[in-house]
Amino acid sequence: MILARLVLLCLLVQAPVVEALERGPEGSIVEQTTVEKIYRGVVFAEVDDIPLSLDVYLPKKKGSRPHLVVFFHGGSWRSGSKESCQVRWLVRHGYAVASVGYRKSHAAKFPVILHDCKGAIRFLRARADALGFQAERVAVAGASAGGHLALLLATTGGVEELEGSVGGHLEYSSRVQLGLGMYSPTDLHHDAITAPDRWDKPASSLFQLLGGKPSEKVALVRKASVTSHITSDDPPVLFLVGGADQPQRIEHGKRLKAAYDKAGLQAVLQIIPGAGHGGPEFRDEQRAALILEMLDKELAGRP
């Protein structure tokens, strides 16, 4: 009982305390806590009169403007929320974090969902000064389906047919400089041709993402596969997956690593012993150190 109370006390001491609320840009609410400045509900685009929004978390410590990490939540492309931001802990290490809300597969199929994500990157670059971060070099991260979108952003920079125009700001680039995927699908084409009995069902997440049977949408499922787009100008990527997750998710990481190796690019694959589909192991001391090392190198230019 005493130990439990001590743990609870530590959590309470570390938790951010809300100090003030005010109005911010693009319809947002600005929330000031003891450790963060938060812009909630920043509208980055409107599609058919429906606003798409994101949240921005900034470290409160004074100094140079922080570098930006953009997060995309999971949920099989059909559920989930930007409130589920699994890399918010990076704010305590001096990084700005944006968590993006994108349309789900009941309202938007591929590649429109990716267009939302690219639109968010362009918007964040366009509004970097107003929101208070650096966006010349940007990292993206995501969990599960969100990791798939993050890794697509990393590997489709400059692919015009996948750019879209959501939110405008087409004078800004959607290219990113580092990709982090956590237990994410990377080779949807492989899944579609090896397990059609599973993925051709209307209830499957891949069927709903593509708007039909994957086995009958071969060209589209190739475009939706991260491994289809890897070229020599792609940025480094980090892929984390649990050793106790489904074998196919581990294979996705291995196929991504193999494709990157073949292209002569940097891909770090870590299979975390005993971890499942998510959990605290993905932000433990060892993983946090690795993520920070790659961010410091690729965004801040620190060796």
What are these regions (language model features)?
Residues 79-82, 98-135, 281-286:
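Catalytic nucleophile-loop/oxyanion-hole region of alpha/beta-hydrolase
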Residues 233, 239-241:
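Short beta-strand/loop motif that positions the catalytic acidic residue
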Residues 105, 272-279:
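Histidine-bearing beta->alpha loop at or near hydrolase active sites
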Residues 246-255:
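Conserved alpha/beta-hydrolase "acid-adjacent" motif
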Residues 122-194:
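Primarily recognizes the serine-hydrolase "nucleophile elbow" in alpha/beta-hydrolase
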Residues 31, 159-162, 190-229, 235:
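Mobile cap/lid helix-loop segments that gate and shape the active-site cleft of serine hydrolases
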Residues 62-66, 72-109, 160-162, 189, ...:
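Short substrate-entry loop that stabilizes the transition state in hydrolases
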Residues 18-63:
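N-terminal cap/lid segment of alpha/beta-hydrolase-fold proteins
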